[in-house]
Amino acid sequence: MIKVVFEEKYYPAVKEIVYRTRLSNGLTVALLPKKEFKEVYGSVTVQFGSVDTLVTEVDGDVKEYPAGIAHFLEHKLFEREDSSDLMSAFTSLGADSNAFTSFTKTNYLFSSTDYLLENLDLLDELVTSAHFTEDSILREQDIIQQEREMYQDDPDSCLFFSTLANLYPGTPLATDIVGSEESISQINLTNLQENFTRFYKPVNMSLFLVGNFDVEQVQDYFERKELKDSDVQDVAREKFVLQDVKQTDSMRMEVSSPKLAIGIRGNREVAEVDCYRHHILLKLLFAMMFGWTSDRFQKLYESGKIDASLSLEVEVTSRFHFVMLTMDTKEPVALSHQFRKAIRNFTKDLDITEDHLDIIKREMFGEFFSSMNSLEFIATQYDAFEHGETIFDLPKILQEITLEDVLDAGHHLIDDGDIVDFTIFPS
C-alpha cells in the first residue's frame, strides 16, 4: 500500500481548504469537502480538446487527426466491452453523469448522494478503458452527424463558430468542436486508439471532488487502489500557425433579426500561469466598454439598436486567446463600425474609469459568491490542473487588479490584434 499525502491550500476569501496531491501514476487529485451539502460532484478533466488534432511523432513528424476526434472519443468511452453503457451504470447507483468537450479539455462528471467509492470506480473505468469496434464507430458517426446538423441549424452557434473560423483560418479552431461532415467520416478505429493512448493517461488528467465526503475516505481509497504503471511524460502541444483573418463576412438564415458578432484575436502569447488573471482582466475591460452598466450600452438599448441579447465571450489559453461580442441588431453594419472604432480607441473610452471598474468588480464579486452555492458550477469551473491561479483566487485577484492592469491587458490584446465581424441576415 502506497501512502497518499495531501497538501492543504486555504482560500481565505471563501474560507475553504482544497486538498491536493499527485499520485504515483501521475494523476492530479484535488478535494474540496463541503459538509453543508448532501451531494458530491466528481469531475475528471482530460487535457484533450478539439484543438488537439496536430501531434508530433517520436521521429519529429507532425501528424494531423480528423477534426472532432476529441468529442467523438468522449461519446465512445461510455460504451463498455459488453456493449452496455456506463451512463446506465451510474444511473443504477443513483448518480447522474455527463460529459462535454471544449477547445482544450474533455470533462466527465457525476453527481450522487451515495455510493461515492463505487462511482469513483465507474469514473476511473470511463477514462482508463476503451472498447471500440468498427460497427459501433459507424453507428456513432451517424449520431454525431445528426448532432452537427442540429448545431448548424442554430443561428447563435453558427454565428459563434463562423466568426471563430474567420479569426483562426487554417487552424483547428476553424472547425466546430464536433467536427465537419468530412472529418467525422474520417474517424476510425486506429486514430481513436492512438488518441486515447496519447491523451488518456493519468499525467494528462485530473480528478476533482466537491461536496459531502470525508477526505480520509478518499485518501484510503487511493492508498488501497492498485495503480497501474503509466507514462508520466507530459503531452506536447502544437502551437498554432496564425494566418490572416477574414475581416468581414455574412450569411443568411431563418432569423427574425440580423445577428452580429465582433471578434478580436490576440496575436501575442499569454504565459500559462497568467491565463486566468488575463481572462478576468479582459472581462473587466469589455464589461466596462460594452456591458449593461456602460453609457454605450444604455444609449444603444434606449434607441432600440440593441437588446438584452448582447453577450461577451472571453477565451484565454497559452496557445490562443480571443474576445467575442454577439448581439441581435437591426443595424449590424453601423454597429460593427462603431464597435470596431471603440475597440481600437479603447484608451479614450469614457466608460473606462476607476469608479466604473469598482462597479464591475463588485458585480463579479457578487456573481462569484452566489455561484459558490452550486456544486455543479464549482465542479465544472475548478481545474485541478491549472498551473497558475484558479477560480478560488478570483476574490484576491479582483482586489489586486488596478485600472492600469486592465489597460495593459487591453494593449496586449488590441494593439497588434485582429478584429473581424460576422453577420447573419434574415433569409
Which sequence ranges carry the predicted segments?
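His/Glu-rich zincin catalytic helix
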Residues: M1-D85, Q193-K299, A409, I419-S427
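Charge-rich, well-structured scaffold segments of protease-associated domains
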Residues: M1-I2, D85-D234, R277, F286, ...
